[in-house]
Design a protein with these regions (language model features):
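Basic, Lys/Arg-enriched alpha-helical interface segments
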Residues: 1-77, 86-92, 97, 101-105
Length: 105
């Protein structure tokens, strides 16, 4: 996420290139305004981009409905990351970031 000085798609040593939607960028901007722990978020994104499994505390799981094919993990109890790992093209796609009510209502 080059604008935020932490990640560049296809950075050296990462298994997956990081891509993100315009909505994710807006969600991240809002999270910064809300003083969310973005260091924790970037650590999770880095693990995902490296192909590492997330610890159980992140409650990583598959989604259904509108987000079928995607996964969700908890950065904080009510702060979620919706993403997809596209193994065929080696891409980590970041779709949304927000609370349960922001994402699913």
């Amino acid at each position: 996420i080059h604008q935020y000085g932490r990640f560049e798609g296809g950075a050296c040593g990462m298994k997956y290139e990081i891509k993100f939607t315009t909505q994710f960028k807006k969600d991240l901007k809002l999270a910064k305004k809300q003083s969310k722990n973005t260091d924790r978020l970037f650590a999770v994104i880095e693990k995902l981009a490296n192909g590492e499994p997330l610890e159980e505390k992140y409650r990583d799981h598959d989604l259904t409905g509108n987000y079928k094919g995607c996964r969700e993990c908890h950065i904080e109890p009510d702060w979620l990351l919706v993403y997809e790992i596209m193994d065929d093209v080696l891409v980590l796609m970041l779709y949304r970031l927000g609370s349960h009510s922001e994402l699913f209502n």
